[in-house]
Amino acid sequence: LLLSSFKPILVMKQNLKTAHYRNGDLIPQVSDNAAWNSLSTGAWCWYKNDSATYAASYGKLYNWYAVNDPRGLAPAGWHVPADTEWSTLISFLGGDPAAGGKMKEAGYVHWVSPNTEATNSSRFTGLPGHFRPFHGQFYGDFGTIGYWWSTTFDGSEGAYCIQLVYNL
């Protein structure tokens, strides 16, 4: 729970791990890169399709279609933030890049060194869960970056997101 001088800003305690929209409809798991690339509907996966390694600590990775689906990805009473809501949170925490350190889990259990300025003073406990781009291929070193969707379309091929990085 974060409190501003204007209104409370509430964030969920853990990442989403649902396989259903709010109305109960199934969100399919898609592991194949080519299938992920050709999607025009919602889907989810585990990072590198490895639930044994990543399921306990990290949430599922969802594509833009799942995030933006009118059936709702988040539980009742919750929603995926719009870009303006992320901006409000970041401003409240001191702007970019100061907010990043306040939002990242401190230490090196999940993040690689140097995990710059990580204090988790916001109690957001951002983890480096990576993401899966539209083309479906996973890349980069795990432990270095985490992404969180916004519901704000960027005008081209996706949506705005925020990212937390190990060295910023």
Predicted regions and their residues:
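Conserved positions within compact, well-structured domain cores
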Residues: 1-168
